[in-house]
From Swiss-Prot:
Membrane-protein topology: Multi-pass membrane protein
Location, primary (coarse class): membrane
InterPro entries: TMEM231
GO cellular component: ciliary membrane; ciliary transition zone; MKS complex
Keywords: Cell membrane, Cell projection, Cilium, Cilium biogenesis/degradation, Glycoprotein, Membrane, Transmembrane, Transmembrane helix
Name of the protein in its database record: Transmembrane protein 231
Organism from which the protein derives: Xenopus tropicalis
Subunit-structure text: Part of the tectonic-like complex (also named B9 complex).
GO biological process: cilium assembly; smoothened signaling pathway
Location(s) in or outside the cell: Cell projection, Cilium membrane
Glycosylated sites: N193, N220
Family the entry assigns: Belongs to the TMEM231 family.
Length: 312
């Protein structure tokens, strides 16, 4: 009658040797070569320790209703101006022109965070006035909270000029975050939670655009208005105001941050284990070859059966 294999299992052998033997030394060397080189390979391949990482978050942005406007009324340097800063308005004297401003923020997806700002400024003009360019600063409160809590006062600069006088400037863009250094992974950071412009200052240098921009760019974290297609509309009736319309969106940002210890360890462990598995497989085959073929002298024998041990 033909016989068929119904079950099989490997026979385990035990290889014994004294402590002071070549076999023991071989095992120690194999252990060192199995676990240390993967660590060196992972470390030397760079990126072993995760120095920076990124995550996505929509910031909590709110318009602060602080505005500084300079409208160029000629190509030779004349201008009209207005701001929400009393010190600046006192300094511009007869160049002050009071505009009409409307601003509305929208939360389109109803998640509790504003998604965009609709801003409109109407600057009244005399029939003989012309506008050749504008420089407009809007300020915002900007907050991140998914990892660390980061709070700052930021700004958007709207700037455009043309040799042809205009009736309207239309901007549609994103308020983008710019980082020179990553944020912390936890804690509270209010380093830049200070006004972009000191509203209590009476000095003209405080309101000079070069000084404002220079001071702002010293920050490691800023916002900038990215509006690649500004629209300058010409042709204004004598009684019409000059109009600035801006749609400023608050997009989801990719935030760079310094990961914590456990996150760095998790990332390093994944790299180490992926290389270690290869070394374990290779040196396991080497050990099988050495001991099965008695390259090094050992005493071999089967491992006692657990069932027989209980019977005895």
């Amino acid at each position: 009658m033909a016989l068929y294999e119904v079950y099989s299992h490997p026979a385990l052998l035990r290889y014994r040797s004294s402590i002071c033997s070549k076999a023991t030394l071989f095992i120690l060397i194999v252990l060192l070569l199995t676990y240390i080189p993967p660590l060196l390979v992972a470390f030397r391949s760079y990126g072993f320790w995760l120095k920076t990482s990124t995550y996505e978050e929509q910031p909590n942005v709110r318009f602060q209703y602080d505005v500084l406007l300079i409208a160029l009324s000629s190509t030779t340097g004349n201008y009209l101006a207005w701001s929400t800063y009393p010190g600046f308005n006192n300094l511009v004297g007869d160049k002050l022109r009071l505009p009409h401003i409307s601003a509305r923020e929208e939360d389109r997806n109803q998640d509790g965070k504003m998604d965009l700002l609709n801003f409109q400024l109407e600057l009244p003009l005399q029939p003989t006035d012309n506008i050749y360019g504008v420089q407009l600063i809007l300020t915002f409160s900007y907050q991140l909270s998914k990892m660390s809590t980061f709070i700052m006062q930021s700004m958007a600069l709207i700037q455009y000029s043309s040799p042809i006088p205009g009736s309207q400037l239309y901007m549609n863009g994103d308020l983008k975050l710019q980082q020179r250094q990553p944020l912390n992974h936890r804690g509270l950071d209010t380093t830049y939670n200070v006004s972009v412009i000191n509203r209590s200052s009476p000095f003209a240098s405080t309101y000079a655009l070069t000084n404002i921009i220079s001071s702002y760019q010293e920050r490691n974290v800023t916002t900038v208005l990215n509006a690649p297609n500004p629209l300058w509309i010409v042709g204004r009736a004598a009684s019409d105001p000059f109009v600035i319309k801006a749609v400023i969106r608050y997009p989801v940002e990719s935030i760079s941050y310094v990961p914590g210890f456990w996150e760095m360890l998790k990332y390093a462990w994944i790299q180490y284990v992926s290389i270690l598995l290869i070394f374990l497989w290779v040196f396991e085959r080497i050990k099988i070859f050495v001991f099965q073929n008695q390259v090094l002298t050992t005493v071999s024998g089967p491992i006692p059966s657990l069932y027989k041990s209980h019977q005895s």
